[in-house]
Amino acid sequence: MLVEKNAPLEPWNTFHIVAKAHSLLRVASCADVQRVLADPDWGPCPKFVLGGGSNIVLTGDVKALVLKVEIMGRRLLRETEQAYIVEAGAGENWHDFVTWTLDQGYPGLENLALIPGTVGASPVQNIGAYGLELQDRFESLDAVDLQTGAPFSLDAARCGFGYRDSVFKHGASGAGPGGAPPQRLGLAGRAMITAVRFRLPKPWKAILGYADLERKVLEAGVSQPSARQIYDWICEIRRGKLPDPAVLGNAGSFFKNPTVSPEQCADIIARDPKLVHYPLPDGSVKLAAGW
């Protein structure tokens, strides 16, 4: 176990902000975390989990033991008549993983191409784009408790997914009546994800309910685009809207699009008929924040 002192963090955040970690451990396995938690010197230290560094803004040096997640690996766990179940280590680059699934013939994540970050961070934010959210393809995850070192797994229900939200962004709710366990699982700062599994459905069906994608379909003159075509279009669209973080530091599209009632949407459209908006299954309407 090699812990770096005063480790530079500039390479590990997409804004390329110059800062240092009091100490940094490159985590290649769950066992690495368990060893550091059991260490009498490092175990009591505050911990800071770091993936791709695309959703953080460093305001100074990090006075904690930074756990830089570098758990790699991707594989097909099993195939059923209904789906491919694939698994990836938390340290895998998200976009590279999406590309790999397509190369292997497992479509279903193409709408989430080119989102910055790691596989392990994807459930934390419940990442989403162009009509698809991570929860739509999520099977389960493995994690380790940063207080006890105990490994555990969560299914979708226990992850508490919401719009760019999950239990990994919240603390536990208050205890129930009579000192019962907390009413809501909250894992912010208490867990590190080590692996994520995805359910990619068969047969595959294209998701095209966004104007940018529909425009690409018309330009290509195809009625049933392939997953690879959608992947390529998503990459083109995103590159046209956002600079490459390696060239110009940025955090990608991390903001939330506001949701309003149909009545509120109608009132706004009356004032700005060109407003980009999308109806949601629950009856509300999502507005394009970047409009």
Please state what every model-predicted region is:
Residues 2-147:
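Anion-binding (especially nucleotide phosphate/pyrophosphate-binding) glycine-rich loop
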Residues 4-5, 10-17, 56, 151-291:
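Phosphate/pyrophosphate- and phosphate-bearing ligand-binding catalytic cores of soluble enzymes
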